[in-house]
From Swiss-Prot:
Site (Reactive bond for trypsin): 16-17
Keyword Aminoacyl-tRNA synthetase recorded: no
Name of the protein described by the UniProt record: Protease inhibitor
Record keywords: Disulfide bond, Protease inhibitor, Serine protease inhibitor
SMART domains in UniProt: KU
Record carries keyword DNA-binding: no
Disulfide bridges in this chain: 6-56, 15-39, 31-52
Length: 57
């Protein structure tokens, strides 16, 4: 995953699992939590806030 992932929109995906993960919000310039459905989505999804901040901030 490269830094371009940080510019992708938040993508929940079509599945119905509820995993708390993080994405980089380019509007607020912060890593924020969201509920990920568990499948598909994109690369702007991180297991921890620290992983998100390491790549995107």
């Amino acid at each position: 995953v490269d830094k371009s992932a940080c510019l992708q929109p938040k993508e929940v995906g079509p599945c119905r699992k509820s995993d708390f993960v993080f994405f980089y919000n380019a509007d607020t310039k912060a890593c924020e939590e969201f509920l990920y459905g568990g499948c598909r989505g994109n690369d702007n999804r991180f297991n921890t806030k620290e992983e998100c901040e390491k790549l995107c901030l």
